Amino acid sequence: MNIRLLHDRVIVKRKEMESKSAGGIVLTGSAAGKSTRGEVIAVGKGRVLENGNIQPLDVKIGDTIIFNDGYSVKVEKIDNQDVLIMSESDILAIVEE
């Protein structure tokens, strides 16, 4: 499926979070909770300013990000994979490794 994102929209693949219980048992999936980290897999052209110019996004494809998992983040299934669609303003940080 081809998707063309509008404005400052970003598609993110959520990274699975691995954590350990107090007893040292590794928890994965729903037992570990939802991660607020992900990888950017698609970006729009940028935010349209009042003067009509387009401000490019700070994030790019391949970036690992930390995001706000709020009401404005939409979950969609694309090519049988759950992804998140959000505005760049929902992104809190870019993780530099």
Curated annotation (Swiss-Prot):
Gene3D superfamilies: GroES chaperonin. Pfam families: Cpn10. It is found in: Cytoplasm. GO terms for molecular function: ATP binding; metal ion binding; protein folding chaperone; protein-folding chaperone binding; unfolded protein binding. Its main location: cytoplasm. Keywords: Chaperone, Cytoplasm. One of its GO terms (cellular component) is cytoplasm. Belongs to the GroES chaperonin family. Heptamer of 7 subunits arranged in a ring. Interacts with the chaperonin GroEL. Together with the chaperonin GroEL, plays an essential role in assisting protein folding. The GroEL-GroES system forms a nano-cage that allows encapsulation of the non-native substrate proteins and provides a physical environment optimized to promote and accelerate protein folding. GroES binds to the apical surface of the GroEL ring, thereby capping the opening of the GroEL channel. HAMAP family: CH10. This is Co-chaperonin GroES. The lineage of its organism: Bacteria, Pseudomonadati, Pseudomonadota, Gammaproteobacteria, Enterobacterales. The gene is groES.
